[in-house]
Amino acid sequence: MTAGPKAALEPLAVDAIALTAETWWRHARVGLRFAAVPTPPPDGRWQHGAVAVALYLADSEATAWAEHYRALAERGLPPAEGFPRNLWRCVVSLARVADLSSVERLAAVGLSAPRPMRSDWPPFQRIGEQLFAEGWAAVLGPSAARPEEGRSLAVFRRDAGFPGVRPPRRPRRVNAPPESVAPIS
């Protein structure tokens, strides 16, 4: 008997890590709540919005801005078009995170290093959606905008929320592109 398109996939061989009270960053349009998700939910590097909803976080302010500039550049918009923004500092505590944060870990599941473009997403989406189906809380990977020094975290929504992720205070409003982070050209 041959396996059909709906045949169960073998579980992915990935290492699990725990994040305990780690600081992560998220930028969003001014006026949105921290974990606001548009309807319909958007696609991201690690998922199609129709399959799984994810909240994307960055390991530093610099990585958050680099990812924002990457998205603007891909749409052909200058950096100033993406402001003002809110920058949220949040605390993340998750017990079961799939660690795909190195080239070696990505290769183990058939992925190459991420490139800063949407056309690179489909193989990552297949892996992310399988991890979601397997019950993982999140995927940790290299930032496509800063692969050598930045990390991104895609936290999957469960039960209409993002357990283990909380903003401890109000966001900081940023009215213009930060000078300390160079936009991607």
Model-inferred region functions:
Residues 1-40, 46-48, 71-185:
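Active-site and NAD+-binding cores of ADP-ribose-processing enzymes
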Residues 45-75:
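Extended catalytic/binding region for NAD+/ADP-ribose chemistry, centered on the ART fold
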